[in-house]
């Protein structure tokens, strides 16, 4: 098989029923197979798939392993040159697949790519989870072409060029299977959130490219599994971000970045408290505690990542403070940040 489009599902019967017909119709290429892996859903997802889409192979996992381990377990059962990790709440478009495949086939130096993500509920806007490709600042804060923190741009074609990026969104991530496993796959310990960024960092550190191909467009609902306002999402984002930094930062930067993040995370917690967001306030504090508890378990991963790394300098990990640019200099779009 050349391309396996794998949807990891958890209680997403409604999403699958809504978006699967378009996916099947728009993915008719030789060597392409759509597969649904199920994280032990308690709804009728599997029964619905067997009834409505019997041609789609199903992989049943015995419990909810989360995004990272769920995908790893599913992909070990799939033989393909390319994997496409696709969220169940993504609606593809007529010509979404060909630009991705065509580019990857002639650029062997590129490990992974993503399409342009637009918001399904606001289709003229970029979507939060990936926009037109992601970057990271000096202190570990993420932003995209088309989205800086909560400032989301309208898509007026301003980012319609193919561009190297630091990370590609897990909502629709095309990756060579060889690169996926060479980098170790998604980190099971993350459970969910930022695990695709961690994977992309490991691939970039090995001098493998990641790009956004905006000729390909998909629409993403976002928050279908875990709502943005859920304190558990806040916890996972803060904890996993710290673990990712610890795993991947060059030795020369680790101490300074982690010291700065200690103060910045404290400031974020106080801002949540000032807004009476008690759940988010406690989530940040819990994330710090969990990071300290888990840190020894990640020491071997850090050592291995540094040994495998071919470079300390990744241009798409930009050397400025996003917080300073956004809140002090009022630069709230990708274009204003980079010009």
Model-derived segments and spans:
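A short, conserved alpha-helix in the catalytic core of glycosyltransferases
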Residues: 160-217
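Short, acidic, metal-binding catalytic loop of nucleotide-sugar glycosyltransferases
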Residues: 21-31
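Conserved donor NDP-sugar-binding/catalytic core segment of glycosyltransferases
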Residues: 91-130, 134-141
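Short aromatic/hydrophobic "clamp" motif used to bind/position activated sugar donors
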Residues: 83
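Active-site-adjacent helix/loop segment of glycosyltransferases
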Residues: 6, 206-303, 307-324, 328
């Amino acid at each position: 098989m050349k391309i396996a489009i794998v949807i990891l599902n958890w209680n997403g019967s409604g999403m699958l029923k809504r978006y699967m017909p378009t996916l099947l119709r728009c993915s008719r290429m030789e060597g392409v197979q759509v597969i649904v892996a199920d994280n032990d859903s308690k709804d009728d997802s599997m029964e619905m798939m067997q009834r409505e889409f019997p041609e789609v192979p199903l992989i049943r996992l015995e419990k909810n392993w989360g995004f990272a381990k769920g995908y790893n377990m599913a992909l070990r059962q799939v033989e393909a040159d390319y994997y496409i990790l696709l969220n169940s709440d993504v609606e593809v478009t007529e010509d979404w697949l060909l630009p991705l495949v065509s580019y990857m086939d002639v650029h062997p130096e590129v490990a992974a790519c993503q399409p342009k993500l637009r918001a399904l509920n606001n289709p003229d806007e970029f979507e939060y989870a990936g926009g037109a490709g992601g970057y990271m600042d000096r202190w570990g804060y993420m932003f995209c072409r088309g989205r800086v923190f909560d400032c989301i741009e309208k898509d007026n074609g301003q980012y319609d060029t193919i561009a190297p990026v630091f990370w590609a969104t897990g909502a629709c991530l095309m990756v060579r299977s060889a690169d996926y496993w060479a980098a170790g796959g998604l980190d099971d310990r993350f459970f969910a959130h930022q695990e695709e960024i961690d994977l992309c960092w490991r691939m970039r550190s090995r001098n493998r490219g990641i790009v956004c191909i905006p000729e390909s467009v998909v629409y993403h609902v976002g928050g279908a599994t875990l709502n943005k306002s859920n304190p558990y999402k806040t916890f996972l984002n803060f904890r996993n971000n710290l673990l990712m930094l610890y795993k991947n930062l060059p030795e020369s930067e680790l101490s300074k970045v982690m010291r700065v993040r200690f103060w910045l995370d404290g400031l974020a917690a106080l801002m949540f408290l000032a807004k009476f967001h008690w759940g988010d306030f406690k989530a940040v504090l819990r994330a710090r505690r969990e990071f300290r508890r888990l840190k020894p378990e990640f020491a071997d991963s850090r050592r291995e990542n540094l040994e495998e790394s071919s470079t300390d300098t990744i241009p798409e990990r930009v050397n400025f403070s996003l917080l300073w640019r956004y809140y002090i200099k009022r630069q709230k779009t990708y274009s204003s940040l980079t010009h």
